[in-house]
């Protein structure tokens, strides 16, 4: 789970799977570690790790048979991260974005190696121009 914040998405969907969460903000990372411990104690899943790092600097943590979740800031994914994904070719991508413009920019590069399987928009902020867009992709 890249750009994981406090782990809301990754920790919710992990179940009993091995999970690595990456966050660059020190405060959010501290809260992430607290949340990881809570999830570990309630589920028994000890295969959860939180890393304090930039998402674009985690080349060795992306596996070919993994699912990568990204929920980047409005500026979108770092170009280096897109390069890493296109090199490592994880099996599936889950891309949640609050900025459809930067998401489309990133998807143009990712769809060289991935096929979009689902797109869903979410209106979490009614009466505002803000939307969230979830795109599911699978390796070609």
Where are these regions (language model features)?
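Rossmann-like S-adenosyl-L-methionine
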Residues: 1-140
């Amino acid at each position: 789970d890249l750009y994981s914040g406090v782990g809301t998405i990754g920790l919710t969907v992990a179940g009993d799977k091995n999970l690595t969460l990456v966050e660059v903000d020190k405060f959010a990372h501290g809260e992430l570690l607290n949340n990881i411990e809570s999830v570990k104690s309630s589920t028994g899943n000890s295969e959860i790790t939180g890393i304090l790092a930039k998402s674009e600097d985690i080349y060795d943590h992306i596996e070919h048979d993994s699912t990568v979740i990204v929920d980047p800031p409005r500026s979108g994914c770092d170009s280096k991260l897109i390069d890493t994904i296109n090199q490592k070719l994880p099996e599936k991508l889950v891309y949640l974005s609050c900025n459809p413009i930067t998401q489309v920019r990133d998807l143009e590069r990712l769809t060289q190696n991935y096929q979009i399987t689902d797109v869903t928009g979410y209106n979490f902020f009614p009466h505002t121009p803000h939307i969230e867009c979830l795109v599911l992709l699978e390796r070609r």
